[in-house]
Structure formats: structure tokens, C-alpha cells
């Protein structure tokens, strides 16, 4: 209780310097100024804390491969300077007068969505990621609720968001590991439940990285029999430790034999160019394959119409993160069942190095930035 009171007192003391004269919120973060993965400090402002908004002081921010694709201009033209980060965990520092979901001092998170039209059929169903007007993303989105300003992400000290689009983080959550759940967690949780995977099902995960190792944990918890497909021998031990019954090195032709028509469900998390037909052929009749990996545009995998004909009643579908209600459901489930990403905590002055390691395939699962180190990164950059 004393810690909470001290936190609130501190927020009151700094409030006069936190807000610009027009009510906008000063923020500082680490930004890319070109497609080269190099970060420098950036001071900017976020929109004012409205009646239905909360201000979150960011504690941890995950690094997603999507951040890198966007920063490197690999999906669509990027507006620089660019502050990435859509896996955000922190503490509520201020609430608008109409806010009921949060109070100052609560833990709160932000995933990939910070707003949407709220009026279309998808939004009314809690499927905000499919908003007919377009979801407003955590970064590099035109925020049509706030004069079309370009959103900046969570590699920063704070974020302003509508309470409706913020996720409640349970008090007992492991804050150092919770942030990636808000993207990697829901991205894999959603299709697994959409396809109604159940105990005893024979399933596969293609790609054992940030997304893949989350998928394995959810599938194992459900009691499914999981086979993992990846490119190297280096991840075989990790596959076993995570609970997989088998590991297949796709570069070993001997191991690939006998895999066709074997699985009722496959989730592909591969963020590079590959042949999806190889995995479709591994499905049983009526089996389903969910594609969640998002490579750079030039590496997008394709399937011809004839390949789909020969898929023979096997289903292939894409899955995009999850809506706000499902994200909350996923987070509550994950914390209750101790399902977390395996992370490496890094200081803010190591983002350059972390990006390069992800690009080079040298990261095992997930990097998380300790945003308490932001001030030190800013000071060291000025030297």
C-alpha cells in the first residue's frame, strides 16, 4: 500500500511537466529515422487523456518481428521517425473522468489495436481487428479518432489509449514476461480455439520462434500431441522441453517421410518464404491449417488455384491477432495457467543489436525491453 501511495504522489508531482499546454502528453522513446535498424531518442507528444482514456507508464515493451518489417519499410511506406512496439505492459498513471475499467496504479497492457470505428458488425462482435473502417494500430496508423495523426508505439515511456482497448493485467502476472502475450499470445491462441483443437488431437507447429513456442504451449496445455517443424537441429531440445512429442528438421529428407495426411491441425508461424503446399499435404482429410506468420511482402508464400483443388477438402485460412475480448480472455487464461513467452530482457540502448539478431535468426524466442532503462539510453546517446 505504501508503494502505491508513493507512486500516486510521484505522479502528482510530475504531472505539471508531463502535459503540454494544449493537454497533449509529452513522451520520449527510441525511434528509427530510416529503414536502417538504428535507434535514437525521440521526444514527441501523444493526444490528450480524454474522458474515456487512460495514460499508461510503460514498464516493458516486447520486440515483435512485425516491428522490424514495419521499420524496414517491408510492408508499406513507413513514416519516419518511427517508434515501434505493440506488446506493451505497464501501470496506469492517469484516468479520464468516465473511466471505470481501471484505476491509477493498476497494471494495464496494449496489444496491436488502440482503436476502431466501434460501430460496424465486426467491432460490435469484439472483432476489432477486422473493423470495416480499419483498426487503428498501435504504431504507423492514421488515428482517425484524433485528426489522422500517425500513431507511435511502445518503445517509449508512456501511451494514451481508450480504456476499451486496454487490457487488464492480473496483479499476479509476471510483468517481465507478459508483454509479448498481447501479440504473440493472442495470435496463436485465437486460431487454436477457432479450430476447436482438443485433447488427443495430432497437430503440428511450423516454425519454433516467438509465435511458435507460444502455440506449442497452448496446444500442449489442451492435451494435443504436438509435432514441431523447423530448419535446424538447434531447436530439437527446446521442442522436447516445451512438450512436443516429435521434432522434424525440414532440411532432413528422411525425417520428412511419412508426414503426409497425419495432422488434424497445423499452425504456420513462419515469417519467411516457404512452400505452404508441403504442409497442406500433411493435413488429414478435413484438417485445418492456420497461417499467422507475416513475412516481408516480397517473401509472401503463394498457393496456386490448382494446388487448392488438390488440397481435397483440407482447409487453409489466415488468422490476424485477435479482438479485444479475446485478447483479455487469452491473457487471463495464460496467467492462470502459467503460460508465458521465454524472454530475454534488454536495456533500451540494445534495441539495435536485438533487431539485428532477430533479422539474422540469432534470437531464440522473444526480446523484451526494460523501459526503466530509457533515460539511461537517452543520456548515453547524447554523449
Question: What residue spans do the PLM features occupy?
Answer:
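Bacterial Sec-dependent N-terminal signal peptides
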Residues: 1-22
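Short N-terminal strand-loop motif that marks the start
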Residues: 21-89, 153, 157-161, 372-383
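C-terminal hydrophobic helical "lid"/dimerization subdomain
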Residues: 22-25, 324-383
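Glycine-rich beta-strand-centered segment in the early N-terminal region that forms part
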Residues: 47-61, 74-124, 129, 170-173
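Cysteine-cluster motifs in flexible loop/terminal segments that predominantly coordinate metals
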Residues: 112-164
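Mid-domain Rossmann-like dinucleotide-binding core that forms the NAD(H)/NADP(H) cofactor-binding site
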Residues: 157, 164-166, 170-252
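Glycine-rich cofactor phosphate-binding loops and adjacent beta1-alpha1 units
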Residues: 195-202, 225-315, 374-383
